[in-house]
């Protein structure tokens, strides 16, 4: 029993370390993706000629 407990403890420790690093990386990646997507949408809207009021309304509702 003691041996199993010891093993699980070390395993969880390594897992936590890995998880933490992976999580931060994923979060950063997600943020950049969202940002880039938003910018592209804005550019597209300006090019097409969407009304400013409509765009602002959409953005407000989204956030």
UniProtKB/Swiss-Prot annotation:
Q: Name one GO cellular component term.
A: nucleosome
Q: Which domain of life is it from?
A: Eukaryota
Q: Where is this region: Disordered?
A: 1-63
> Could you tell me in which tissues this protein is expressed?
Testis.
Cite a single GO BP annotation. sperm DNA condensation
Does Nuclease appear among the keywords? no
Record-linked PROSITE patterns: PROTAMINE_P1
Q: Which residues cross the membrane?
A: none
Q: Name the UniProt key words of this record, in alphabetical order.
A: Chromosome, Developmental protein, Differentiation, DNA condensation, DNA-binding, Nucleosome core, Nucleus, Spermatogenesis
Any one GO molecular-function label of the UniProt entry:
DNA binding
> Where does this one sit in the cell?
Nucleus; Chromosome
Question: What InterPro entries would the database entry show?
Answer: Protamine_P1
Q: Which family does it belong to?
A: Belongs to the protamine P1 family.
Q: What is this protein for, i.e. what is its function? A: Protamines substitute for histones in the chromatin of sperm during the haploid phase of spermatogenesis. They compact sperm DNA into a highly condensed, stable and inactive complex.
- Protein name (record): Sperm protamine P1
Q: Which gene encodes it?
A: PRM1
